[in-house]
Amino acid sequence: MLKKQQRIAAASPKTVLGSPMANADLVADSIKRASGLDVDFIVFPELALAGASLGSLLSHPHMLDLSGRALESICRATENLSITAAVGYPCEINGSVRSAVALINRGSVLATSFSDCAEAPFGFIPSVEYHLSKPRSIFPRNINVVFGNELLSSKLSVPDGNVTLIPSFLNATAHSDRLISEALRRYTAISGFAAAYAAPNSGESSSFFLYDGLCAISAGGEIIAMTEPFSDDPFVYADVNAAWLASAKAVPVMQQPTYYLSQKPERAAHECRRILRLQAEALRRRLEHTGGRGFIIGVSGGLDSALAAIAAVKAADMMGLPRSGVLGVSMPGFGTSIRTRENSRKLCEALGCSFREISIVDACAAHLEAIGHGTDKRDVVYENAQARERTQILLDLANMENLLDVGTGDLSEAALGWTTFGGDHLAQYGVNASLPKTVIRRVVAEAKAEFREAADTLQDILDTPVSPELLPSQAGEIAQKTEELLGSYEMHDFFIYQFVINKEKPSAIVEKAIRELPFDPGEIRRAFDVFIRRFFTQQYKRNCAPESPHILASISPALWRMGSDVLPDGSFREGNAGGTENA
């Protein structure tokens, strides 16, 4: 038990990715800042000296050497300070690169602990049961180090000590704030310890994950200090004493997500707002990295491009850029309806974006004639030529005007392969890629309150049937309705969650869908057969998908690894699938 009051802190100074010496200076400055506040213990994120998102470069001998030198630099800079700091860095042990945490006090490394995680951390995947770390040296009696991924493990035991420092590499998701808060409260309630938690920040790569620099202090089953997500100054401290630790409330139950969004309306609304914030942060980080002057989006008058436009506008606002730096491009083709064409323009005008309309009809007709196809044959070539023409226009304009081409494709489309290879399948960054269509609908609905100037147009977009609009229609109406062709997205998004996240057996997924979804059993079985067939045969598109942030559920090549020539046999569906669909 704690004998006296102690002050503990957590900090996540903005990472300079791949620059250990620069990070060492930032860490040393934070240690000095904490020491000036009479802090006794401070924790920094896992791999803070190199960057948690550095990937394979973490194991490069040069990076390991620089990280070791950076650690020595921190020791020299803090040799006269009594504060104890937990600093994360990559380290080679017996020929294997591991995430290490050094406990530094008065210029010396008191102890080091090593995680059993692979050299390239793979992000926040709550369903994974992590291996626990094995300390390689003895810690002072009153200090304990637990890695962030262990905090979520059901196998985490309570070691000796009364202060737990938790360096983490866990990324930000729609649910991570709640999960980490509940895990900290549970840990401190059970252990009787105080705990300080620090996660990586927005200086990390946004290629596949986002990091919000979450820092928190917990004691007695309560969160007593926590930073705001993506804070400009992720640094917190708090005083804890024996009274705090003795006053633990009832042990909180860790509730893993049971579906994409909470069943509680207030929590679901919070998650929708957080999703949009994460999307905007991802775009901000990517634009800062590329040095572009703004964003370009192909606006179709549909849900996906509406959300991408909103996220881009929010990112521009956060960066202090004019909304005119967001360019929405409408590219009407053979099947574009009057309604979606008008909504594309109205949305951009309401949001204050720049707007441009470029018809692709003549360009596509010329292309089809040039390859000997003609415009009277309404097949897959006819449809895909339009999608590829739009992508070419967007990428060329992005180059010409120094803009970031923001992809609009979503998780549902990626799972079903409902994209054109080399067409809307490509972009410079896919901001919607981890969000299913049904969630996008709810995020857009929630966004109406924030973007009131566009609320009427957003509502009309919400009321518009989902369609690729690639086939001509009569009287300017929508000819193709995706859910009439594939089945309801409510079913397909359910299948994705159960198959990819819960990893349920196909038979169990169908049985669960019949129990829980408002559809005829025969319709559910037909839709599931479509889902499984297309999920397997369309993998080749996902294997070369653009980089995208993992916010809800990802089947990007960084997280879902599967050969494109794997076919669903009797293990996954009745009968054998044959052939591939090279759309």
Please tell me what each predicted stretch does:
Residues 1-298, 309, 314-325:
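Enzyme catalytic cores with a strong preference for nitrogen-chemistry domains
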Residues 4-7, 18, 192-193, 205, ...:
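ATP/NTP-dependent adenylation/nucleotidyl-transfer catalytic domains that generate, transfer
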